[in-house]
From Swiss-Prot:
GO cellular component terms, A-Z: ribonucleoprotein complex; ribosome
Function, as annotated: One of the primary rRNA binding proteins, this protein initially binds near the 5'-end of the 23S rRNA. It is important during the early stages of 50S assembly. It makes multiple contacts with different domains of the 23S rRNA in the assembled 50S subunit and ribosome. Forms part of the polypeptide exit tunnel.
SUPFAM superfamilies named in the record: Ribosomal protein L4
Protein's recorded name: Large ribosomal subunit protein uL4
Database matches in HAMAP family: Ribosomal_uL4_B
Chain spans, region Disordered: 44-85
InterPro entries recorded: Ribosomal_uL4, Ribosomal_uL4-like, Ribosomal_uL4_dom_sf
Membrane-spanning intervals of the chain: none
Basic residues bias (residue ranges): 58-70
GO molecular-function terms, A-Z: rRNA binding; structural constituent of ribosome
Family: Belongs to the universal ribosomal protein uL4 family.
GO BP: translation
Keywords (A to Z) from UniProt: Ribonucleoprotein, Ribosomal protein, RNA-binding, rRNA-binding
Length: 206
């Protein structure tokens, strides 16, 4: 698989040969869906909580007598049928949202995503991406010259200036190959990879 190489001005140069094992796989939508759902589920903090009828603070006194009022019988105001009462099946912080995905499946899913992005022309390669100073304006000018507005930058080592400059840009993220996740790869319109990072990705996923 050949990936297009961009210079600092956004002009295309000679193509970069990439491994077909990583960038030339068939599109497997079911597998991609599985690893994205697992990634989102495992990222949940699991801190939502609601109260059942034992936990809400209500009196246990019977609201009115059982018979003779003409109203429906009621035992206590903490009943789930009442406004302000407890939930019948409340959410708990003890719930387990984790999804298990085998390493082999995870690698295959990432390869499928990279391959589809390459076919759609959403991957571009640069020799390197560095900044002289941690200035957002400098990085924004670089991306503008390349025609990039929503971009995931995958670099072999995250330069401190590059990281600091990217923090204030919307729809821009800078990561190392080992931290490239399936959701980010799908979310951003373009993926910009340094030459050294391409080799690292091939080593990680082959």
């Amino acid at each position: 698989m050949e990936l297009k190489l961009l210079n600092a001005n956004g002009q295309e140069g000679a193509a970069v040969n990439a491994s077909d094992v990583v960038f030339g796989r068939d599109y497997n939508e079911a597998l991609i869906h599985q690893i994205v759902v697992a990634y989102q589920a495992n990222a949940r903090s699991g801190n939502r909580a609601q109260k059942d009828r034992e936990q809400v603070k209500h009196t246990t006194k019977k609201p009115w007598r059982q018979k003779g009022t003409g109203r429906a019988r009621a035992g206590m105001s903490s009943s789930p049928l009442w406004r302000g009462g407890g939930r019948i099946f409340p959410n708990s912080p003890e719930e387990n949202f984790s999804h298990k995905v085998n390493k082999k499946m995870h690698r295959a899913g990432l390869c499928s995503i990279f391959s589809q992005l390459a076919r759609e022309g959403r991957i571009a390669v640069v020799d390197e991406l560095t900044l002289e100073a941690p200035k957002t304006k400098l990085l924004a000018e670089k991306f503008k010259a390349m025609g990039l507005d929503s971009v995931l930058v995958i670099t072999d080592t995250v330069d401190e200036n590059l990281y600091l400059a990217s923090r204030n840009l919307a729809h821009v993220a800078v990561v190392e190959p080992r931290y490239a996740d399936p959701l980010s790869l799908i979310y951003f319109k373009k993926v910009l990879i340094t030459k050294a990072a391409v080799a690292q990705i091939e080593e990680l996923l082959s």
